[in-house]
Amino acid sequence: MSKKTERQLSSAATQRAAFSFTRRTLLRTAAATAALAAGPAFIKRGFASSGEVNVYAWSDYVWPEQIKSFEKATGIKVNLSKYGSNDEVLTKLKASKGKGFDIIFPSVDTGPTWYQSGDLLQPIDESKVNVDMILPTLWKKSKKLGGVFRRKRYLVPHDWGTEAMIYDSSQRDYKYGTLSYSDLWSEENKGLVTVRQKSSFMGIGLYLDRIGEVPSNRMLDTYKDEASMRAVWDKLLVFAIEHKKWVRQFWNNTQDTLNAFYQNNAVIGQCWDGPSLRMMKETDGKLRYLMPVEGGLGWLDTMAIPSGAANVENAYAFINHLLTPKMGGIFANNSGYNSAVVGANEYLESDSKKVFAEAYPEDAIDRLWWWAPQPAWWSAARAQYVDKLNAA
């Protein structure tokens, strides 16, 4: 990749423009295209009607109901493998040179890292994807967030979500508008916190920028170049190491998060919305998920076809199966994340709608901080800071 292209992908301007994503925009685009969902769900004709498809997905992304209905409709067997992080799937596909799987689910901001890591993904043939079933806002904005490279699309929106604050409301009384990432590091929460190392740096950075202690233009300056990033992250590392004793358990996947609260008695954490909203439902609101004053961390996950996929047509068939309202609803109700499919909200259960409204009150969606496209140098540097925190 040329230096110019890399700068374009990682610039602060790209991050600011990429997601003018608000509650109003989401509702408006969903309503404007909901009529598309009224017709029968379908899988585009012309795909193979037998064989298999090898799916490599996040642990809580593909559900038995989705697999069963797909296999019944197509005769194609789904072989599902699961991973827990973007680093895990990238490492595996690097080692196999893009072979072994037909569909993966990368976060859109990791697109630049994929493109700079070799020929690991193949361009998407948009004529084979039911693009009309994807919320137009997400389809359009995913282009600027990392889904398109050199005028070719590689990443198809699947879902969006957040990483923000979850806490035990029987022991803490936080409110929207005052809850902050800084509450993780209050004296009363010492030894009771769960965070993911690499994203905890972002929460710390947004907090320290807000109070003027470590100015970073809401962390956007860290995407300009490596020197600018390290100037900020060096200071964040000092804070993180000084407060490492506050952490009861680090998490890296959904199961880790569930264990932190259900088994290891964490009281507060910075966690994904999926497991957090699931726990919110399962505990009748005892565990609560809420956006901090600095803004929750917004992300968009996608579907991609590796360069060495053996069952490409079956991969497109499975992608289109997931891009139906009913399948989007099944995903959202089970995972706690938000489907990118037009009409999926019509299949949301009442408790899913309830916890969503409580997690994102007032202007919470408008205030989200969206992960910017991550060039390879940024991801590599972040990994170094995580290693230093782990070793401290």
Regions found by a protein language model. Name each.
Residues M1-F21, A34:
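N-terminal secretory signal peptides
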Residues F47-W114:
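Early extracytoplasmic/lumenal segment of secretory-pathway proteins
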Residues V108-G111, Q116-R248, N252-D256:
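Extracytoplasmic ligand-binding site segments that recognize negatively charged/polar headgroups
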